[in-house]
């Protein structure tokens, strides 16, 4: 059996889910630190919207080998985030401790 590299890639939905889970964790930590009340930053579908967030900056690292994420899915994630009120920049880099490849996201509210 021959498996093409596209069959081994992470789906857009899985990439979006991983990103949203990581961002939700960052927002929860931020809320604890700031001890500020604001409206729920997630819409009814569980996607992060940022609509009611005060200004904040979040850093997210996802340990995913680069060959498992297509440029198309990454670009779609960045576009969808911008449509939801977030400014997201991404960069591939190696973890300094483990040498594992990871994607780094810098997330700010627009």
Per-region residue spans from a language model:
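C-terminal edge-of-domain segments
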Residues: 80, 85-110
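N-terminal leader/targeting segments
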Residues: 1-71
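A short, charged, amphipathic alpha-helix used as a generic interaction element across diverse proteins
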Residues: 31, 74-84
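Short, well-ordered helical secondary-structure segments
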Residues: 2, 73-75, 94, 100
């Amino acid at each position: 059996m021959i498996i093409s590299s596209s069959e081994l890639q992470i789906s857009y939905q899985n990439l979006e889910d991983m990103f949203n889970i990581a961002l939700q964790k960052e927002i929860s930590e931020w809320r604890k630190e700031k001890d500020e009340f604001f409206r729920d930053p997630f819409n009814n579908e569980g996607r992060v919207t940022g609509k009611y967030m005060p200004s904040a900056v979040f850093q997210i690292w996802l340990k995913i080998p680069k060959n498992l994420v297509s440029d198309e899915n990454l670009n779609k994630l960045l576009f969808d985030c911008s449509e939801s009120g977030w400014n997201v920049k991404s960069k591939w880099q190696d973890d300094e401790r483990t040498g594992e490849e990871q994607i780094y996201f810098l997330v700010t509210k627009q």
